[in-house]
Amino acid sequence: MSPQERDHSILEGALGLARESGLESLTVRAIAARVGVTPALVAHYRPGMDAFVADVFGSIVADEREEVISAFDDSPFRDTDELRGGLLRLIETLLDADRDDVTLIWVQAWALGARNEALAARVRQEMDGWQSVLEGIFARAAADGAIEAGRADTAAWLLLAMVDGMNAHSLVKWAPRDRADLARRALSAVLDSAAPDALVGARSSDAGSADTRSTDTRSTDARSTDSRSPDSRSTDT
């Protein structure tokens, strides 16, 4: 086996081990046992385990991002419903229980990154990658008039934070069983945050009208009560 092939086999072994047991399982001995070589050989090809763990993490999560985002083409969003449909599919995909192996890798990377600067840097890079991709989708939606312009970054950040949080919760079974419904509610919150000002204004106007009607009703009731009061007193007298 050539040096390149040997290095590739070590990487593939580490990738498989991480998917099965998470990043915390990546030790020189565990990888060596997985590949069927000596620990010394693994250490020879990958002398820095911190950097190797970062490489394994980056490879797995970058592949997932490419797979998920490939479902979005460059065609314009004709309306908000079309944007909603596309994003709903994306969220449902990311919340799918079949992806819990990648979720565990993300969660462990956030924790291990506190002591592994190479991993921390790669985590930031991959999160920036997700933020950039999602911003691009929302920016296209804004250009097509589906959401308010200038809110793509906020919408992308909110979507990413909610998906990451809900996925982390699911690892300890602290999440609704109906993930599809969870996805719909999450998406509604994101799109409401990026709704055009006209729509927000309409909601405010409706709320204001309701308040005005309520106030008018109370005023009318008060006047009616006042007009009845003198009559009542006169009758009593």
Residue ranges and their predicted role:
Residues 55, 68-103, 155-159:
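Hydrophobic alpha-helical connector segments
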Residues 204-236:
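Long, intrinsically disordered low-complexity tandem-repeat segments
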Residues 47-51, 77, 114-118, 132, ...:
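Residues in soluble alpha-helical coiled-coils and helical-bundle/repeat scaffolds
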Residues 6-9, 16-55:
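Helix-turn-helix
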Residues 89-97, 104-115, 189-190:
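Helix-loop "lid/cap" segments that line or gate small-molecule binding pockets
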Residues 58-65:
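Short, basic, alpha-helical segments at the C-terminal edge of helix-turn-helix-like DNA-binding modules
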Residues 66, 98-107, 117-143, 154:
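Amphipathic alpha-helical packing segments from all-alpha helical-bundle domains
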Residues 120-124, 128, 142-203, 235-237:
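Hydrophobic/aromatic-rich alpha-helical bundle segments in the mid-to-C-terminal region
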